[in-house]
Amino acid sequence: MSSRHFKIKNSLFWWVAGLALASDRLTKAWIVATYALTVPPQTTPIIPGVFHITYVTNTGAAFSLFANGSIWLRWLSLIVSLGLITWAILGPRLDRWQQVGYGCLLGGALGNGIDRFLTGEVVDFLDFRWIQFPVFNVADIAINIGIVCLLWSAWHPR
């Protein structure tokens, strides 16, 4: 008797996307439950002057780019997400770096996209003060990791 195993194509893509999305949603839920959205923002120094948890919202894209662009950004994140899902299902089998890269992009796009559709703005809270960088979130990290993985894959083909 032969046993058939159902194997999902690009399974690492789905795992990475799920992990990125879950990490983003859980950390944002914790921030919203723990901190008040105030002006000036409520902040907790983790390493004073270097890294703080600072609850702010952002109507733009990653790192506050395109501020006040939440209407078109919500649709862009939906289109990107649907495109990545379609690519993973109907496209070719991706190499490991591509699966991680596209999975990170999907998880990040969904994480910030959910915020944009629910509230019109994205929750940000990771505040690295020693480099004077905009406050960001886990979805932003996932998107940037995804870009690095895809660049790596392009520069180091199988």
Curated annotation (Swiss-Prot):
Pathway field: Protein modification; lipoprotein biosynthesis (signal peptide cleavage)
Stored InterPro entries: Peptidase_A8
Catalyzed reaction equations: Release of signal peptides from bacterial membrane prolipoproteins. Hydrolyzes -Xaa-Yaa-Zaa-|-(S,diacylglyceryl)Cys-, in which Xaa is hydrophobic (preferably Leu), and Yaa (Ala or Ser) and Zaa (Gly or Ala) have small, neutral side chains
One of the Pfam families matching this protein, by short name: Peptidase_A8
Segments crossing the lipid bilayer: 12-32, 46-66, 71-91, 135-155
Catalytic-site annotation from UniProt: D124, D140
GO annotation, cellular component aspect: plasma membrane
Keywords of this entry: Aspartyl protease, Cell inner membrane, Cell membrane, Hydrolase, Membrane, Protease, Transmembrane, Transmembrane helix
Molecular function GO terms recorded: aspartic-type endopeptidase activity
EC number: 3.4.23.36
One GO BP annotation of this record: proteolysis
Membrane topology recorded in Swiss-Prot or TrEMBL: Multi-pass membrane protein
Class of this enzyme: hydrolase
Subcellular location: Cell inner membrane
HAMAP family recorded: LspA
Similarity comment: Belongs to the peptidase A8 family.
NCBIfam families recorded: lspA
Function of the molecule: This protein specifically catalyzes the removal of signal peptides from prolipoproteins.
Protein name per the record: Lipoprotein signal peptidase
Lineage start: Bacteria, Bacillati, Cyanobacteriota, Cyanophyceae, Acaryochloridales
